[in-house]
Design a protein with these regions (language model features):
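Catalytic cores of glycan-processing enzymes that make or break glycosidic bonds
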Residues: 1-206
Length: 206
């Protein structure tokens, strides 16, 4: 959002009260970067509060936005309006089950409300898969979307809980400490990843 507008607080202020909004550099910054460096593969982190001017800036830039599956099943929403439901993903987007700042998919499903878990089941049309295996069907959801790119954290491929979470924003201590072990890269996992990426035409042989 800071590229569109940012909150300016005078130096020496004890609180943010004297601050005010300033216009950011906008699309001209990205045009200058492109002119200097050429086309670059940039993903717009368009999460959280989005004003219409920010949305327009993302559209003008042409950068793909982010679509996070874990944001899709808020029980306060109704119908299919959520931009984070996979059938609403545009081609020019990058789809994630979750990011480094989110819970793992397994723990997220365990911690949402029963109403939200019901929404997930309804959306999947799946009332039989054991909860411990449901993460695989949720990964398949975003692979079936129109998003040009899908990014699945290794913790979600492995079906791990929050003990493998990367980062919890605004906290200190155990963040950024999880490491993938060689022993976790099994032939079974390789076969599962190969199968789903091939099935949905997302195998990149380049």
């Amino acid at each position: 959002r800071g590229f569109d507008e940012y909150f300016s607080i005078p130096y020496g202020s004890e609180t943010a009260a004297p601050g005010h909004w300033e216009k950011g550099p906008g699309i001209e910054l990205f045009r200058a970067v492109e002119q200097a460096l050429g086309k670059r593969e940039i993903i717009a982190e368009d999460l959280g509060y989005m004003s219409e001017t920010v949305r327009q800036l993302v559209r003008d830039s042409g950068f793909p936005g982010m679509k996070v599956l874990e944001f899709a099943f808020d029980s306060r929403d109704t119908g299919s309006a959520s931009d984070y439901l996979p059938h609403n993903y545009p081609v020019n987007s990058v789809a994630y089950t979750g990011t480094h700042d989110n819970e793992t998919l397994v723990s997220w499903y365990q911690t949402i409300t029963s109403a939200e878990r019901a929404l997930v089941r309804d959306y999947l049309c799946d009332y039989a898969t054991p909860e411990a295996q449901l993460y695989k069907n949720m990964i398949a959801l975003i692979f079936r979307s129109a998003a040009a790119t899908c990014i699945i954290p290794m913790q979600d491929w492995l079906g791990l809980d929050n003990s493998a979470r990367i980062n919890k924003p605004s906290t200190v201590g155990e963040n950024w400490r999880w490491r993938l072990k060689k022993s976790q890269l099994t032939p079974k996992l390789q076969k599962e990843i190969c199968s789903i990426t091939t099935r949905y035409g997302r195998m990149n042989w380049a």
